C-alpha cells in the first residue's frame, strides 16, 4: 500500500507551493526534491494566488509569521480550495504566542485543510483554542505514550471530524487519523528531535504525498510519516563517531532520495485502529 503512494510522487513530480518559515526553507526544498517532488517558495501577497494556481499542492507553515505572510497564507489557501488542491497546515509553536494562535485559528476558519500536522501540544492548542507549547516543541506532559494512546487516537478522530482534515500527530509515537480510522506509527529515531526542521520537512513531504494521491489523503499521510521515520533510522545508522546533527540532517535527505517503495513497505511499522 505505501509503495504505491511513493511511486505516485515519483511518477507525477508534483509542484508544491510552500509558504513556510525562513529557518528551514532550504531543508524543505531539498526534502521535496529528494522525495520526487518539485518545490517553489513564494510568500509575497502579489504572487501567491498565481503561484498556487500552477502548483499541485500547498504547504502552509506558521513558524515565522509576519503581517504580510499571514495575508499571503489566507489568499493562497483560498485559491487552493477553489482549485481543489490539497493543503497542509503545520502550526509550528502555535501555543507560544497570541499571534500564532489567532493566525492558526483564522486559517482554520477560512481555509479547508486536507492535513493538519504537528506535535501533540500544537494539535491540542488548535483543537482547544488555548494552551501552551515549549517554544516549537511538545510539552513533556503531552507526550504520546502507550498508556495514553487510546485517548489520543479518539482525540485525533474527534478533531478530524470537526475540521474535515486528516490529523497527523507526530513524535516518538505518530498518530495519523481521520474521523473513522487511525494509524499508529513506530518508526523514527529519538535523535531526529535534535535537528531543527525535521517536522517542517515532514510537512513539506506530506504535501507532496497528498498531492500525488488525492483520493487517499489518510494513506498518503501514513506513507509520508513512515518514510520520514524510516529515513531517520537509516540515516542514524550511517553516522560515524565524529558526525553530528548537521551530518544527520544531510543523511536523512539522502535516505529520502534513495528510498524505494519496497524498502518503504518492508521497514514501515504501523498498526491500524
UniProtKB/Swiss-Prot annotation:
UniProt keyword terms in alphabetical order: ATP-binding, Kinase, Magnesium, Metal-binding, Nucleotide-binding, Thiamine biosynthesis, Transferase
EC number: 2.7.1.50
Top-rank taxon, per record: Bacteria
Residues where ATP binds: 117, 170
Reaction equation(s) it catalyzes: 5-(2-hydroxyethyl)-4-methylthiazole + ATP = 4-methyl-5-(2-phosphooxyethyl)-thiazole + ADP + H(+)
Keyword Nucleotide-binding: yes
Keyword Signal: no
Cofactor: Mg(2+)
One Gene Ontology term of the molecular function aspect: ATP binding
InterPro entries reported for this sequence: Hyethyz_kinase, Ribokinase-like
SUPFAM superfamilies on file: Ribokinase-like
Pathway: Cofactor biosynthesis; thiamine diphosphate biosynthesis; 4-methyl-5-(2-phosphoethyl)-thiazole from 5-(2-hydroxyethyl)-4-methylthiazole: step 1/1
Residues that hold substrate according to the record: 41, 197
GO biological process terms, semicolon-separated: thiamine biosynthetic process; thiamine diphosphate biosynthetic process
CDD domains, per database record: THZ_kinase
Purpose: Catalyzes the phosphorylation of the hydroxyl group of 4-methyl-5-beta-hydroxyethylthiazole (THZ).
Family, similarity comment: Belongs to the Thz kinase family.
Protein name: Hydroxyethylthiazole kinase
Organism of origin: Clostridium acetobutylicum (strain ATCC 824 / DSM 792 / JCM 1419 / IAM 19013 / LMG 5710 / NBRC 13948 / NRRL B-527 / VKM B-1787 / 2291 / W)
Amino acid at each position: 500500500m505505501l509503495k504505491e503512494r511513493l511511486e505516485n510522487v515519483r511518477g507525477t513530480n508534483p509542484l508544491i507551493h510552500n509558504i513556510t518559515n525562513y529557518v528551514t526553507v532550504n531543508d524543505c526544498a531539498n526534502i521535496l526534491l529528494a522525495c520526487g517532488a518539485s518545490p517553489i517558495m513564494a510568500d509575497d501577497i502579489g504572487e501567491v494566488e498565481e503561484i498556487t494556481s500552477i502548483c499541485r499542492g500547498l504547504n502552509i507553515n506558521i513558524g515565522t509569521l509576519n503581517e504580510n505572510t499571514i495575508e499571503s497564507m489566507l489568499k493562497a489557501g483560498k485559491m487552493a480550495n477553489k482549485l481543489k488542491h490539497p493543503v497542509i497546515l503545520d502550526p509550528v509553536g502555535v501555543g507560544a504566542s497570541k499571534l500564532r494562535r489567532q493566525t492558526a485559528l483564522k486559517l482554520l476558519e477560512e481555509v479547508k485543510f486536507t492535513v493538519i500536522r504537528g506535535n501533540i501540544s500544537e494539535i491540542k492548542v488548535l483543537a482547544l483554542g488555548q494552551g501552551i507549547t515549549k517554544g516549537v516543541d511538545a510539552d513533556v506532559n503531552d507526550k504520546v505514550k502507550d498508556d495514553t494512546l487510546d485517548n489520543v487516537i479518539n482525540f485525533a478522530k474527534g478533531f478530524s471530524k470537526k475540521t474535515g482534515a486528516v490529523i497527523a500527530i507526530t513524535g516518538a509515537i505518530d498518530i495519523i487519523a481521520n474521523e473513522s480510522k487511525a494509524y499508529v506509527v513506530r518508526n523514527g529515531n529519538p535523535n531526529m528531535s535534535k535537528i531543527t526542521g525535521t517536522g517542517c520537512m515532514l510537512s513539506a513531504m506530506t504535501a507532496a504525498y497528498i498531492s500525488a494521491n488525492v483520493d487517499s489523503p489518510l494513506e498518503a499521510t501514513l506513507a509520508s510519516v513512515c518514510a520520514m521515520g524510516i529515513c531517520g533510522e537509516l540515516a542514524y545508522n550511517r553516522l560515524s563517531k565524529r558526525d553530528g546533527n548537521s551530518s544527520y540532517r544531510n543523511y536523512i535527505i539522502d535516505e529520502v532520495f534513495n528510498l524505494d517503495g519496497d524498502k518503504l513497505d518492508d521497514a514501515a511499522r504501523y498498526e491500524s485502529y
